[in-house]
Amino acid sequence: NFQIRDEETFSLCIPTDRDYKILQLTDLHLGFGMFSGKKDKLALEAVTELIHRTEPDLMVLTGDSVFPFFPKSGTMNNRKQAEKLLAFLDGFQIPYTLVFGNHDCEMGSTCNKEQLAEIFTTGKYAVFTKGRYEHSPQNPITGVGNFVVDLTDDQGKLLLPLILLDSNMYGDGWFFSGFDRIHEDQTDWCMEKL
């Protein structure tokens, strides 16, 4: 029961007759490569157990879902990683959304963030859009995947807005520069949306 209202806002109808459960998953670092098979299997088993145990209404992946870093995963193909992750998540038939972390697109990976975002929009249960981003035709802001998921009741009344922001990658785009952050133009956009 979700629909996109505009390029940066989803509306997701939630049940009001019981508690609504959101499962947060972070830093899965799925590689789906020649060096990460055992680790990936353990991570997917743990996620499956969490989903069955908690029976969430929405899953929120908060960065570093995939890890296209050859020394750890044995591949730089984050396109394949994203497609496998979507197939896995869609199998549960539960809506999910996500934000990027610093490892989802490493230097030399197959897809940049905009390309990876296009893949994530194709998930059957994905509540995801590129939203307002660095190369938006109008009013660009830092990052990719800055958007809102408005949780509403069955009458369309807003119960809770979830603001999703790209925390970006590295300070100057390179691994050794240190982690980036949420930028002021992103927080300004948040204030506009609220």
Task: Describe the residue ranges of each PLM region.
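Extended active-site neighborhood of metal-dependent phosphoesterases/phosphodiesterases
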Residues: Q3-S11, K80-L194
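N-terminal active-site segment of His-dependent metallophosphoesterases
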Residues: N1-R79, K84
